[in-house]
A protein has these predicted regions:
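Short, aromatic- and glycine-rich surface loops/edge beta-strands on solvent-exposed regions
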Residues: 63-73
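Short, intrinsically disordered/low-complexity patches at protein termini
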Residues: 47, 56-58, 68-69, 78-82, ...
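Asparagine-centered strand-capping/turn motif at beta-strand->loop junctions
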Residues: 13-14, 18-31, 36
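Extracellular beta-sheet/turn segments enriched in Thr/Pro/Gly and aliphatic residues
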Residues: 1-13, 75-91
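Beta-strand-rich interaction surfaces with strong enrichment in secreted/lumenal proteins
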Residues: 11, 32, 44-47, 55, ...
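Intrinsically disordered, low-complexity Pro/Gly/Ser/Thr-rich segments with frequent PxxP/GP/PP motifs
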Residues: 40-64
Length: 91
């Protein structure tokens, strides 16, 4: 088991779901919040990426997320359909 790999909140690693590997890099000086998207609305919190850091994640296949920053907490920056093996760099 690789200790550098994280899982979204409320999704245990032992769930019988197919996962994909993604990496997030936060180049900002503030935290970015990653939320799941359900329909066209914000769903549950999936992850926090701390300033100037990077994290590897295992997300459920076909996940769609949105990024919201602490500086503009009421604005969706984008909707992203996650692709296996991709690195997502913010900004």
């Amino acid at each position: 088991m690789d200790l550098d790999i994280h899982y979204p909140y409320n999704i245990p690693f032992y769930t019988d779901v197919e996962f994909i590997s993604v990496k997030f890099i936060n180049n900002e000086d503030h935290i970015i919040n990653i939320f799941f998207v359900k329909g066209n609305t914000q769903g549950n919190l999936a992850a926090l990426i701390f300033p100037r850091s990077e994290r590897k994640y295992q997300f459920p296949k076909n996940s769609i997320i949105t990024i919201i920053t602490d500086k503009k907490p009421h604005k969706f920056h984008c909707f992203i359909k996650l692709i296996d093996g991709m690195t997502y760099i913010y900004p």
